């Protein structure tokens, strides 16, 4: 009985989601039909604005990344020079070999 209820509920949800998908697709087509003439009219402004915005965002991202990398390297160099190494991550390096191996019998 539980499987029947589950199947009916799943079919109802699937039907509702398909209905929403169809409504969304129809709305997207109507919006595309309405907005296409506006994009054609304003394209001499929109295309350069898009290019400028993309270049500006890429420049800020690259600048921030280079600055963060440089700061990390300078911080590492300073800690190396002053003898204050970063704490080691446990388990990252293998443990040192034992001075008395198990098979030596000593």
From Swiss-Prot:
InterPro entries per record: Oleosin
PROSITE patterns: OLEOSINS
PTM section of the record: Proteolytically cleaved following anther tapetal breakdown.
GO cellular component: extracellular region; membrane; monolayer-surrounded lipid storage body; pollen coat
Example GO biological process: anther wall tapetum morphogenesis
Keyword Acyltransferase: no
Membrane topology: Multi-pass membrane protein
Major location category of this protein: secreted
Membrane-spanning ranges: 14-34, 37-57, 58-78
Expression across tissues: Present in pollen (at protein level). Inflorescence-specific expression, especially in flowers florets.
Domain of life the protein comes from: Eukaryota
Single GO MF descriptor: lipid binding
UniProt cross-references to Pfam families, sorted A to Z: Oleosin
PANTHER family referenced in this protein's UniProt entry, alphabetically: GLYCINE-RICH PROTEIN-RELATED, OLEOSIN
Similarity comment text for this entry: Belongs to the oleosin family.
Function: Lipid-binding oleosin involved in anther tapetum development, especially for the physiology of tapetosomes. Also implicated in the formation of pollen coat.
Listed name of the protein: Tapetal oleosin GRP-19
Originating species: Arabidopsis thaliana
Lineage: Eukaryota, Viridiplantae, Streptophyta, Embryophyta, Tracheophyta
Gene from which the chain derives: GRP19
């Amino acid at each position: 009985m539980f499987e029947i209820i589950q199947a009916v509920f799943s079919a109802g949800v699937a039907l509702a989601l398909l209905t929403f998908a169809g409504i969304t697709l129809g709305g997207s087509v109507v919006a595309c039909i309405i907005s296409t003439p506006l994009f054609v009219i304003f394209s001499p402004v929109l295309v350069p604005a898009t290019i400028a915005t993309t270049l500006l965002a890429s420049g800020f991202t690259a600048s921030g990344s280079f600055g963060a990398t440089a700061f990390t390297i300078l911080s590492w160099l300073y800690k190396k020079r002053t003898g204050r190494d970063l704490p080691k991550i446990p388990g990252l390096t293998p443990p040192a070999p034992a001075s008395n191996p198990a098979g030596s019998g000593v």
